[in-house]
From Swiss-Prot:
Sequence similarity: Belongs to the LolA family.
Entry protein name: Outer-membrane lipoprotein carrier protein
Species for this entry: Actinobacillus pleuropneumoniae serotype 5b (strain L20)
Primary site of residence: periplasm
InterPro entries: LolA/LolB/LppX, OM_lipoprot_carrier_LolA-like, OM_lipoprot_carrier_LolA_Pbac
Gene Ontology cellular-component annotations: outer membrane-bounded periplasmic space
Transmembrane segments: none
């Protein structure tokens, strides 16, 4: 009797795991389908940062630009300027306040920078996240326990119009980005080329080197 019960429980667990994996695969496929419907766009964004207790601690504005495949640019204008650029192979982060540039490969950065997924169809990128869907909201959770990120939410309708996205970090702090003034087409590939500004320190995490231009 105990053996039969154990086998039944094991079978139920396997079915549950298979069902969850199937649901996850469906959610990934649907999110990718929606993202692929719009190949390029430009939008303004409003950012709201909240503490783990839900208190607003900062707000900001900037511009978000995408060109598939694998190119995106997030240019934060306020309250403090910074720039994130994916050129398809590398992810660049520039902080003009401290005059520092950090660069990593897209492959290594995707675990902590899920924005990469908004322009990527690379299976190795998507395999780093569990994905679930609730209507027009998709919830992505990194599989790696080493990730600084707890959750990434994407709000996108069936026509492929991205409404916004949000991140929740391990410490509970959240960042909400709401897109507005969205326009499609006319996004120059030159926007996704990055050169280290003169005088800026370069932290090259692709090889662990630091240098100054």
């Amino acid at each position: 009797m105990k053996k039969l019960l154990k086998q039944s429980l094991l079978g139920f667990a396997l079915v549950s795991m298979t069902g969850a994996a199937f649901a996850d695969a469906q959610s990934v496929a649907e999110l990718q389908r929606r993202l692929e419907q719009v190949s390029q766009y430009s939008a303004d964004f409003d950012q709201t940062v909240r503490s783990s207790k839900g208190k607003q601690i900062q707000s900001g504005k900037g511009k978000f630009q995408v060109k598939r495949p694998n190119l995106f640019r997030m240019d934060t204008k306020s309250p403090q300027e910074n720039l994130i650029v994916s050129d398809g192979a590398n992810l660049w982060f520039y902080d003009p306040f401290v005059s520092q540039v950090t660069v990593n490969t897209v492959q290594d950065a995707v675990n902590n920078t899920p924005f990469v997924l908004l322009t990527s169809s690379d299976k190795s990128h998507w395999d780093q996240y569990d994905v679930t869907q609730n209507a027009d909201t998709f919830v992505l959770k990194p599989k790696s326990k080493k990730s600084n990120l707890k959750q990434f939410d994407v709000r996108i309708d069936q026509s492929g119009m991205l409404k916004g996205f949000s991140t929740i970090e391990r410490d509970g702090q959240s960042n909400l980005y709401v897109l507005r003034n969205i326009t499609g087409g006319g996004v120059s590939s030159d926007l996704f080329k990055f050169s280290v500004p003169k005088g800026a320190e370069l932290d090259d995490q692709r090889g662990g080197k630091k240098s100054k231009k």
